[in-house]
Amino acid sequence: MGEKPGTRVFKKSSPNCKLTVYLGKRDFVDHLDKVDPVDGVVLVDPDYLKDRKVFVTLTCAFRYGREDLDVLGLSFRKDLFIATYQAFPPVPNPPRPPTRLQDRLLRKLGQHAHPFFFTIPQNLPCSVTLQPGPEDTGKACGVDFEIRAFCAKSLEEKSHKRNSVRLVIRKVQFAPEKPGPQPSAETTRHFLMSDRSLHLEASLDKELYYHGEPLNVNVHVTNNSTKTVKKIKVSVRQYADICLFSTAQYKCPVAQLEQDDQVSPSSTFCKVYTITPLLSDNREKRGLALDGKLKHEDTNLASSTIVKEGANKEVLGILVSYRVKVKLVVSRGGDVSVELPFVLMHPKPHDHIPLPRPQSAAPETDVPVDTNLIEFDTNYATDDDIVFEDFARLRLKGMKDDDYDDQLC
C-alpha cells in the first residue's frame, strides 16, 4: 500500500539564495463570485535583511508589444493592477490571521518566515498569452500575473534581480457546472429573380467542450432553389477582443474542414461533420490566443472567457470566444453561412487531482521534468506531509533559460 501523497508547496529562491518564496499553488481560480486568495510565505536570511523591510508585490500586466522594442523609456506594457504587502516588519494594523497552509509553513520554516496575502479583484482578466512568431524574442504578449519579493528600506528603493524573487502565477477559469443550451442557427437565402429559396440549418450536440474534444456539427440543407451547392465548409474560429486603450476584435481560424458534398436543386441534405480545434495544428499562427503559461511549459488554445452577468463590460485585457462557421459554396455566387457560438474550457478538477495534461503537450520522453522534490523532517505530526517543490518548469530540449532571475538555487 503506497504512502499518502504530501501537500505540494512550490518554492523559489533569489539568485543569491537569501530570499525564498513559498506558494501552495500556481493556478488561482476565478469562480465568478470570488477569486482564490494568494497566500504564501517568504523566508529571509536575517543576516542579509539587517535593517531593511521585506516587501511582496502582485502585478497584473498587459504586454502588447515586443520586449526588444522597449527603448527610450517607452514600454509596450500596461499595468492593470498592482498591490503591495509589507511582510516584515508587520504593519501596525491588525494582522490578518494566517491560513492553514501558512500556519503549517510558519511552524516548519521557523521565525524568519513571514506570511503575505493578496486578494485578486474579480474584474481582472484571466492569464492569456498571444502566440509569438518564429522570429519573435523576449516575453510574449498577453496578460500575466507576477509575484515579486524583495528586501529594501522603502518601496522607492530600486531592487536588483539578484536579490529578488519573481514568479509567474495564473488566474484561470474552469468549465461551469451547468452548461448553456444546445447551440443552433438557421438562415434562408432568396436569390434574385427567383421566389425559390435555399435553407441552411446547423447545430452542435452541446454548448460546452473540453480542450481536445471533437465537435459534432449537424448540417441540414433544404435546397428549393435552382442553384447547386458545390461545397460545404466547416471551420472553428477564435475571436479575441483586445480591450486596452480601445477595443478591437481579432479572429483566427483554428480548425477547417472542406467537403465536396453537393446538394442539387430541389433536394435535401443532412450530415454530421466532426472537427477538432487543436493547438498542434496552429503552431505557426502569430497572435493566436493561448492559455497563460509558465515559461517552457506547453499549453493549449485559450479557454473561453466567462464574464459574470452585470460585470463591467470595460474590463481591460483579452476576452476569448469561439464560434463554428458553416458555409455553403453555391454555384454562380451567393454563398450561405451561419455561426454557432460554443464554450471551450478545461473541466473543473477535483480536489487533490492535478489539471489534466494539455492535449498538445509533447511526449514525456521529449520533456524531462525537473521537479527536485525535497521533504523535510518535522516534530509536528500535522506537517509531515508537506513536500517542497522548486518553482520549476518543463525544460524543452534544445532550449535554455535566458533570464538570469529565473535560475534556481
Curated annotation (Swiss-Prot):
Effect after changing S360 to A/D: Reduces interaction with CHUK
Chain positions covered by the region annotation Interaction with AP2B1: 363-409
Gene Ontology MF terms in the entry: angiotensin receptor binding; D1 dopamine receptor binding; enzyme binding; G protein-coupled receptor binding; molecular adaptor activity; protein kinase B binding; signaling receptor binding; ubiquitin protein ligase binding
CC annotations in GO: clathrin-coated pit; cytoplasm; cytoplasmic vesicle; cytosol; endocytic vesicle; endocytic vesicle membrane; glutamatergic synapse; nucleoplasm
Predominant cellular place of this UniProt entry's protein: cytoplasm
Sites of Phosphothreonine modification: T382
Alphabetic keyword roster: Cell membrane, Coated pit, Cytoplasm, Cytoplasmic vesicle, Hydroxylation, Membrane, Nucleus, Phosphoprotein, Protein transport, Signal transduction inhibitor, Transport, Ubl conjugation
Modified residues (Phosphotyrosine): Y48
Record's keyword annotation contains Cell membrane: yes
Phosphoserine PTM sites in chain numbering: S360
Positions of modified residues (Hydroxyproline): P176, P181
UniProt-reported outcome of changing K231A: Abolishes interaction with CHUK
GO BP term (any one): positive regulation of cardiac muscle cell differentiation
Subcellular location field: Cytoplasm; Nucleus; Cell membrane; Membrane, Clathrin-coated pit
Residue segments, region Interaction with TRAF6: 240-409
Record's keyword annotation contains Cytoplasm: yes
Motif ([DE]-X(1,2)-F-X-X-[FL]-X-X-X-R motif): 385-395
SUPFAM superfamilies: E set domains (SSF81296)
Post-translational modification comment from the UniProt entry: Phosphorylated at Thr-382 in the cytoplasm; probably dephosphorylated at the plasma membrane. The phosphorylation does not regulate internalization and recycling of ADRB2, interaction with clathrin or AP2B1. The ubiquitination status appears to regulate the formation and trafficking of beta-arrestin-GPCR complexes and signaling. Ubiquitination appears to occur GPCR-specific. Ubiquitinated by MDM2; the ubiquitination is required for rapid internalization of ADRB2. Deubiquitinated by USP33; the deubiquitination leads to a dissociation of the beta-arrestin-GPCR complex. Stimulation of a class A GPCR, such as ADRB2, induces transient ubiquitination and subsequently promotes association with USP33. Stimulation of a class B GPCR promotes a sustained ubiquitination.
Self-association state and partner proteins as the record states: Homooligomer; the self-association is mediated by InsP6-binding. Heterooligomer with ARRB1; the association is mediated by InsP6-binding. Interacts with ADRB2 and CHRM2. Interacts with PDE4A. Interacts with PDE4D. Interacts with MAPK10, MAPK1 and MAPK3. Interacts with DRD2. Interacts with FSHR. Interacts with CLTC. Interacts with HTR2C. Interacts with CCR5. Interacts with CXCR4. Interacts with SRC. Interacts with DUSP16; the interaction is interrupted by stimulation of AGTR1 and activation of MAPK10. Interacts with CHUK; the interaction is enhanced stimulation of ADRB2. Interacts with RELA.
Entry remark concerning the domains of this protein: The [DE]-X(1,2)-F-X-X-[FL]-X-X-X-R motif mediates interaction the AP-2 complex subunit AP2B1.
Functional description taken from the UniProt entry: Functions in regulating agonist-mediated G-protein coupled receptor (GPCR) signaling by mediating both receptor desensitization and resensitization processes. During homologous desensitization, beta-arrestins bind to the GPRK-phosphorylated receptor and sterically preclude its coupling to the cognate G-protein; the binding appears to require additional receptor determinants exposed only in the active receptor conformation.
Assigned protein family: Belongs to the arrestin family.
Protein name: Beta-arrestin-2
Species this chain originates from: Homo sapiens (Human)
Gene, per the UniProt record: ARRB2
